[in-house]
């Protein structure tokens, strides 16, 4: 009868409601008798002395956290200790050795190409002076009659030629009427503009 009850009930984490406390206390004897037996490996380990227990490195991963060799043990994952010891230790670090092993030439390509010489002739790449190229302009009859050619040979509209005055070619065009400026607007500086009322009083 006792062997039939073993393993028929196990604690699943629910202890019942507080109102069913009397009911759970009455079933405590059944729970103790019906709980499953521990594994045979656990029972054998309990019978052995503690000095013979073999703990893994994962179990002892927090035992030597403050020591100098804390980086050598695999924390949370397995690592090859021989390869790890060759790569980096507390005194030898892997990135520094990799940089020294894969170190390139001490002279850069820029230093090899552009050496300090006596002048520009020593440079492999000669400097090309900038030449300003003017765009091509279309020539019109107005530019031919009223404008003089510029330095580049193109006709511009900034300089009026003296050989063809505008008044002789177009004498019948009326002049543009411009409003006559008052006297108090014809001052040379800002200080004179502040005293424009005095100038009007003198003229009056």
From Swiss-Prot:
<dbReference type="Pfam" id="PF15115">
    <property type="entry name" value="HDNR"/>
</dbReference>
<dbReference type="GO" id="GO:0005929">
    <property type="term" value="C:cilium"/>
</dbReference>
<protein>
    <recommendedName>
        <fullName>Ciliary microtubule inner protein 7</fullName>
    </recommendedName>
</protein>
<keyword id="KW-0966">Cell projection</keyword>
<dbReference type="InterPro" id="IPR029369">
    <property type="entry name" value="HDNR"/>
</dbReference>
């Amino acid at each position: 009868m006792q062997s039939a009850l073993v393993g028929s009930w196990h604690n699943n984490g629910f202890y019942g409601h507080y109102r069913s406390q009397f009911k759970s206390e009455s079933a405590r004897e059944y729970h103790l008798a019906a709980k499953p037996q521990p594994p045979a490996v656990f029972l054998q380990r309990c019978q052995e002395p503690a000095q013979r227990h073999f703990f893994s490195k994962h179990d002892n991963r927090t035992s030597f956290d403050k020591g100098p060799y804390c980086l050598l043990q695999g924390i949370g994952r397995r690592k090859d200790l021989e390869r790890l010891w060759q790569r980096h230790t507390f005194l030898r670090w892997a990135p520094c050795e990799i940089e020294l092993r894969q170190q390139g030439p001490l002279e850069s390509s820029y230093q090899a190409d552009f050496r300090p010489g006596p002048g520009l002739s020593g440079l492999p790449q000669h400097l090309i002076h900038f030449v300003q190229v003017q765009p091509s302009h279309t020539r019109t009859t107005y530019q031919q009659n009223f404008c003089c050619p510029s330095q580049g040979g193109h006709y511009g509209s900034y300089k009026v030629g003296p050989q063809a005055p505008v008044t002789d070619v177009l004498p019948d065009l009326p002049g543009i009427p411009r409003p006559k400026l008052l006297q108090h607007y014809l001052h040379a500086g800002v200080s004179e503009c502040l005293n424009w009322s005095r100038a009007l009083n003198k003229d009056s």
